[in-house]
Amino acid sequence: MTQISFADFFNETKKRGAARPVVQTAPAVQSEQVPSRLISIDTARKQFISLFNQTARHLHRWDVFSDFVRLAASELDIARVRTPENAENSRKICARYDADDIRNFHELFRLMVCALEAKFHDFIGSIFMELELGSGGMGQYFTPYSVQSMMARMLVSGIKETVTREGIATISDPACGSAGMIIAYAECLLEADINPSAHLFASCIDIDPVAADMAFIQLSLLGIAAEVVTGNTLTMQFNRVRYTPVYYLNDFEAKLNTQRRLKAMMDFMRDISKAA
């Protein structure tokens, strides 16, 4: 399955003129010499939380977390990563942090990648809840991944037949949070010997920009083709639409067009059969 490796994360941001350029030091390089697969999910989670709590202590935890996910999401958005707007937004965020904090962001990203490489799960959503960053006013509560896995298994019946018939399976989540439900569904495909990077397209919407960033990051790193929309499902007012790297790399636009034509043809044949 296709997973994206971003060992040089934030390098583009630094090259594009961050207020305080970060120079890679020996300790930062040494920290990446430990093979990622030697780090368990639980170890990655504990190290992530510990390091996060040491990063930019003068700033509110919510601000640091949202800045981290904004930077990560912007660097994974291959359609916009080199645009002047993206470069300026990244520069403004980086200007709030010193060199040590930026290095911590590097390490936080590495730990997140390690955890997601080990197993499909909602890593960043569980971190979000453990740090108690949810908004009660927005009813922001991310369902435990074990529950999402159980729900996904209820939806996956007949998935092999769908993929054989249409080439891809599609799933939609109108209030996706950190995309835990989508990830659980993709994991079910893996268990059925179906490559989600080639045969799954997800449509995700969330009203909270930070939640949408979290979803975009995890789906990008796990190699899941997805459309991630920031907006309100009820009012149909949408502010931003992004597609994960695998959407472009595996040409899902063509796959979706083929699926639509196939469905239209099947509907047409069904109507003719009924008329006869």
Regions found by a protein language model. Give the residues of each.
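Charged/polar, low-hydrophobicity segments characteristic of intrinsically disordered regions
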Residues: V29, F105-F109, D213-I217
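Class I S-adenosyl-L-methionine
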Residues: T2-G17, P21-V22, A26-D193, L234, ...
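Generic hydrophobic segment detector
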Residues: E117-D122, Y185-E191, A215-A226, Q259-A276
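Conserved S-adenosyl-L-methionine
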Residues: Y145-Y247
